[in-house]
């Protein structure tokens, strides 16, 4: 069972319009190597859409196609209100009832709980297009993928960009920003 608070791929549908997958999709399945953006064996977003870097809307469409093809049990527009662990079983309370499971995987994503420490400024998830932002100088707080995506897109409008962060991966052994 997959419980989704919105539609399938909801957070991807809310990416800024200019945002694309960072890792390119390649149809390497025939060579025994999966497409890095694929979520199911023998599938490839690159093959499905003939694109190397998919938009969020396109990737959400891929997720929906995979869910349909594999007949996955997805409960959309369903909020989880509580999870309890009783006698070795998880009880997941939703607005449509309680589900039980031996294991649960929490995949809430950045868009579900955006970190907004200030009463001013915009979170990356609030931007639809970078061209809508007025000004010629922007300050970006943060140093991971969204920050650099914003910086690149804003610089293409001719704006001056400053990025401030307390953490970078430049001297880290592991480049995965999710563990910093």
Model-identified regions with their sequence ranges:
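Flexible, glycine-rich phosphate/dinucleotide-binding loops
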Residues: 9, 21, 83, 113-114, ...
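Glycine-rich active-site loop/strand segments that organize a redox cofactor
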Residues: 3, 7-60, 168-170, 174-177
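A generic local structural motif
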Residues: 91-94, 123-129, 179-180
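Feature captures the FAD/FMN-dependent oxidoreductase FAD-binding
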Residues: 45-112
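Short, glycine/charged-enriched secondary-structure capping and boundary segments
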Residues: 15-19, 89, 118-121, 153-156, ...
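Short glycine-/acidic-enriched loop or helix-start segments at secondary-structure transitions
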Residues: 11-13, 85, 115-117, 150-151, ...
């Amino acid at each position: 069972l997959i419980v989704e608070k919105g539609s399938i791929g909801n957070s991807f549908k809310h990416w800024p319009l200019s945002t694309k997958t960072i890792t390119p999709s390649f149809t390497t399945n025939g060579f025994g190597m999966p497409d890095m953006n694929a979520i199911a064996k023998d599938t490839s977003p690159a093959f499905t859409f003939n694109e190397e870097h998919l938009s969020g809307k396109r990737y959400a469409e891929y997720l929906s196609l995979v869910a349909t093809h594999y007949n996955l049990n997805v409960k959309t527009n369903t909020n989880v209100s509580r999870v309890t662990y009783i006698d070795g079983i998880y009880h997941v309370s939703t607005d449509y009832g309680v589900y039980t499971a031996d294991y649960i995987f929490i995949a809430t994503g950045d868009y579900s709980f955006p970190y907004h420490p200030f009463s001013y400024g915009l979170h990356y998830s609030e931007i639809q297009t970078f061209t809508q932002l007025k000004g010629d100088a922007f300050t970006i707080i943060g140093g991971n993928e969204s920050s650099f995506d914003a910086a690149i897109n804003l610089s293409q409008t001719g704006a001056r960009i400053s990025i401030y962060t307390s953490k970078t991966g430049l001297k880290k052994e592991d480049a995965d920003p999710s563990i910093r």
